[in-house]
A protein has these predicted regions:
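Carbohydrate-active catalytic/glycan-binding domains of CAZyme proteins
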Residues: 1-341, 345-384
């Protein structure tokens, strides 16, 4: 489950992972991060007992690691709602051999069944996916909360805590963002979330995932640029289609529909698995070169892309198929004015719909919505 990697004191790369249905942590080692890794050993106490098998241990899950000097800090945990046998995420300190525990597990973030430990976590208790980062002398504990769709963080001056809850970094359905909608309204199907923050050049990003195929088990990797306040805290970022682009996307040319950050239907619920909502899917197997597309776009639903730098766009060319009896519409906000539309035709082959739509110059979103009966699929679009 959700392995993590660190560079040991010897300069080698150590991969920490937990196998399905086993309570212990395995470690593999390699001279390069790309492999091939060789088995190194199991994380264990000084007496040889494996972590996870000692009386009182909680089963290991989702390892997160950071190495400083000769010490490696290993974070583990899973806390499902209603499970009183799990209390939160623990950190263990490992010796320079990368497997021997020299400081026993210590609770650093409470789960939803352990509200007395640190009340500041109670609205966003630990669920899974612990990850640790360091910036400007502060340690950032990033995790998935019991709400599942959000990645939260806590801060400390020490890798072993105590940690203070900081806030939400990102929600894969944009709950909590109220700049363009009500903060309780999802704009995509929410589900569990994994990821962390990392510095690339002079900028910091949050990596996370969202879901495809209307299931919890198909996922699409995403990234958003984040910023820090003077006190080191992080403001929640909205989900976009920009990824690592460093700014708005160029407002010309073709784009695949699967980069939509908003895949929504009016009055949809928060979590994935709902019927009659649009979702990203694919034809064929993983790895095929055929483009993914957005399936089941129906009345009062649509897909949104943030953001584009528009300049002189007069037409949007949409590639769609399906058995619809309505119109594809172009907007620059979810409920904004329809700038252009085209009537769809019954077909199971991809068709091109040229839609005259003069989009105002400047930075703004693009929304492709649908009105009418039946349903369609959207594969890509071109800004002309």
């Amino acid at each position: 489950y959700a392995p993590d990697i660190t560079i040991g004191p010897d300069g080698k790369y150590y991969l920490y992972y937990v196998l399905d249905h086993l309570p212990i942590v395995s470690v593999a080692v390699c001279d390069t991060p790309a492999g091939e890794f060789e088995f190194h050993g199991y994380v264990h106490y000084a007496d040889g007992t494996k972590l996870g098998e000692k009386e009182g241990d909680e089963p290991s899950f989702d390892p997160g690691v950071i190495t400083e000097g000769d010490k490696t800090y290993l974070y583990l945990g899973f806390c499902g709602p209603g499970d009183t046998s799990r209390t939160g995420s623990f950190v263990s300190v490992l010796d320079k051999d990368m497997v021997t525990i020299i400081e026993n597990p210590k609770l650093v973030a409470p789960g939803c069944m352990n509200k007395e430990f640190a009340p500041d976590f109670n609205e966003h208790p630990f669920f899974e996916a612990p990850s640790i980062r360091k910036r400007n002398g502060k340690y950032y504990f990033v995790y998935s909360s019991a709400a599942m769709h959000e990645l939260c963080y806590a801060m400390s001056d020490s890798p072993v805590g105590p940690f203070t809850y900081g806030g939400v970094i990102v929600s894969n359905c944009d709950l909590g963002i109220d700049t363009y909608k009500d903060g309780k309204t999802p704009v995509a199907p929410g589900a569990n979330n994994h990821g962390s923050i990392i510095e690339i050049g002079d900028e910091w990003y949050i990596f996370y995932h969202r879901h495809t195929n209307n299931t919890w088990y198909c996922r699409q990797g995403c990234a958003e640029k984040i910023s820090f306040n003077e006190d080191g805290t992080i403001n929640q970022v909205e989900i976009t289609s920009c990824g690592l682009n460093g700014g708005p996307l160029v407002g010309k040319g073709k784009y695949p529909a699967y980069i939509a950050c908003h895949v929504y239907k009016k009055d949809m619920g928060v979590y994935i698995g709902q019927s009659e909502v649009p979702f990203i899917k694919q034809d064929g197997a993983d790895g095929d070169k055929r483009l993914s597309f957005v399936h089941n776009v129906t009345e009062n639903s649509g897909i949104g892309f943030k953001y584009f730098e528009f300049n002189g766009v007069k037409k949007v060319r949409v590639f769609a198929r399906g058995y619809g009896m309505g119109f594809i519409e172009i907007r620059t906000s979810m409920d904004g004015e329809v700038l252009g539309k085209a009537q769809v035709h019954h077909t199971n082959h991809w068709q091109v719909y040229d839609i005259d739509a003069a989009i105002p110059d400047g930075v703004s979103p693009l929304y492709i919505t649908y009105s009418g009966g039946g349903s369609i699929e959207i594969q890509e679009f071109e800004l002309v």
